[in-house]
Curated annotation (Swiss-Prot):
Homodimer. Keywords: DNA-binding, Repressor, Transcription, Transcription regulation. It comes from Mycolicibacterium smegmatis (strain ATCC 700084 / mc(2)155) (Mycobacterium smegmatis). Controls the expression of genes used for utilizing diverse lipids as energy sources. GO terms for biological process: regulation of DNA-templated transcription. The gene is kstR. This is HTH-type transcriptional repressor KstR.
Length: 204
């Protein structure tokens, strides 16, 4: 299947178009928050966003594109609200644990919404490759910048990719009730320790 282009915010020429895209994603998040993945239907999103269904499809070709784009926006929001002072100083272990904990709390706050966005991300096909890649890079960047006290190194980006995969795997385990929130925290702490060490025994 070929990649289907989604109109990103940077590609929208007018303020009206950017506002319309924002309304569409707001509507998607609101519907998913109350009903999960199955509740996100294109017609329902169009009605809540006050746009024509045809217009919605020009912005987002499917509900998968919608939900993966919504996940990307949520990560951007979390990143923008992160207290950089809390990430300053300390060790890579402390800073990365802070970021992992922040993401865990954000995603566990609304299980239905998280289930909808994560399900779309995990099962997206090649047509949504651009959106999936964007979300993956956002995760990697957040973790890599948390590890680094400046510009992340190539090795830190590689480690961040592994942390992203472990984090997503454990988020899925929590969503499917195969792991508790405590289990997830312990597993991720172990992964971080193995990859970058602790305050007493740093590896990077």
């Amino acid at each position: 299947m070929t990649n289907v282009a989604v109109l990103s915010e940077s590609e929208l020429g007018s303020e009206a178009q950017r506002e319309r895209r924002k309304r569409i994603l707001d509507a998607t998040l609101a519907i998913a928050s109350k009903g999960g993945y199955e509740a996100v239907q294109m017609r329902a999103v169009a009605e809540r966003a006050d746009v024509a269904v045809g217009t919605l499809y020009r912005y987002f070709p499917s509900k998968v594109h919608l939900l993966v784009s919504a996940l990307g926006r949520e990560f951007e929001r979390i990143d923008a609200k992160t207290d950089r002072a809390a990430l300053a100083g300390g060790t890579p272990y402390q800073r990365l644990n802070f970021m992992v904990g922040k993401l865990n709390r954000a995603m566990q706050r609304n299980p239905l919404l998280t289930e909808a966005m994560t399900r779309a991300f995990v099962f997206a096909d090649a047509s949504a490759a651009g959106e999936v890649d964007h979300v993956g890079k956002l995760m990697d960047s957040m973790f890599a910048r948390a590890m680094s006290d400046g510009e992340p190194t190539e090795d830190q980006y590689h480690i961040a990719r592994v942390i992203s995969d472990v984090w997503l795997s454990n988020l899925l385990a929590w969503l499917t009730r195969r792991a508790s929130a405590t289990d997830v925290s312990k597993r991720l702490d172990l992964a971080v320790r193995l990859l970058i060490g602790t305050e007493e025994q740093p590896k990077i």
